[in-house]
């Protein structure tokens, strides 16, 4: 890998983690971990796959930037993150990628129990 390529990858990686700061805490944690895993997993791929990988993550960063900007400007105060994948894009995925996408969707749509507070009449000893 050339120094220029490594610099581009690192810059994109940092930019994505920075954009994740706009996400709700549970999605930020999920997104950060997913990005770290994916970038680590693609460290040793060939040049063609590396270019596709970077292109997709650059698109993700651009979409997330726009959604974060729209969220800040929204008068309703509701943040809306994410997008639907067109069927033709899904058809390009390998089985392993479909499995990862399914796991990610399940994690992202889980009820957030991290911050839920339940009242208890008595302490449990």
From Swiss-Prot:
Keyword line: Chaperone, Mitochondrion, Transit peptide
Keyword tRNA processing: no
Encoding gene per record: Sdhaf3
A Pfam family recorded for this sequence: Complex1_LYR_2
Primary localization class, coarse: mitochondrion
PANTHER family named among the record's database cross-references: DC11 ACN9 HOMOLOG, SUCCINATE DEHYDROGENASE ASSEMBLY FACTOR 3, MITOCHONDRIAL
Subunit organization: Interacts with Sdhb within an Sdha-Sdhb subcomplex.
Protein name per the record: Succinate dehydrogenase assembly factor 3, mitochondrial
InterPro entries per the UniProt record, alphabetical: SDHAF3/Sdh7
Source organism superkingdom: Eukaryota
Compartments it resides in: Mitochondrion matrix
Transit peptide: 1-30
Function description: Plays an essential role in the assembly of succinate dehydrogenase (SDH), an enzyme complex (also referred to as respiratory complex II) that is a component of both the tricarboxylic acid (TCA) cycle and the mitochondrial electron transport chain, and which couples the oxidation of succinate to fumarate with the reduction of ubiquinone (coenzyme Q) to ubiquinol. Promotes maturation of the iron-sulfur protein subunit Sdhb of the SDH catalytic dimer, protecting it from the deleterious effects of oxidants. May act together with SDHAF1.
Transmembrane segments: none
GO CC annotation terms, alphabetical: mitochondrial intermembrane space; mitochondrial matrix
GO biological process, one term: mitochondrial respiratory chain complex II assembly
UniProt record similarity statement: Belongs to the complex I LYR family. SDHAF3 subfamily.
């Amino acid at each position: 890998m050339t120094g220029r390529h490594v610099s581009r990858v690192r810059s994109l990686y940092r930019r994505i983690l920075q954009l994740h700061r706009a996400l709700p805490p549970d999605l930020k944690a999920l997104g950060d971990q997913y990005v770290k895993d994916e970038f680590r997993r693609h460290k040793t791929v060939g040049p063609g796959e590396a270019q596709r990988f970077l292109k997709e993550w650059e698109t993700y960063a651009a979409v997330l930037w726009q959604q974060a900007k729209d969220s800040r400007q929204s008068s309703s105060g509701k943040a809306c993150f994410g997008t639907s994948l067109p069927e033709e894009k899904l058809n390009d995925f390998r089985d392993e990628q479909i499995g990862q996408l399914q796991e990610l969707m399940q994690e992202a749509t889980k009820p957030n129990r991290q911050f839920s507070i339940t009242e208890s009449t008595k302490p449990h000893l």
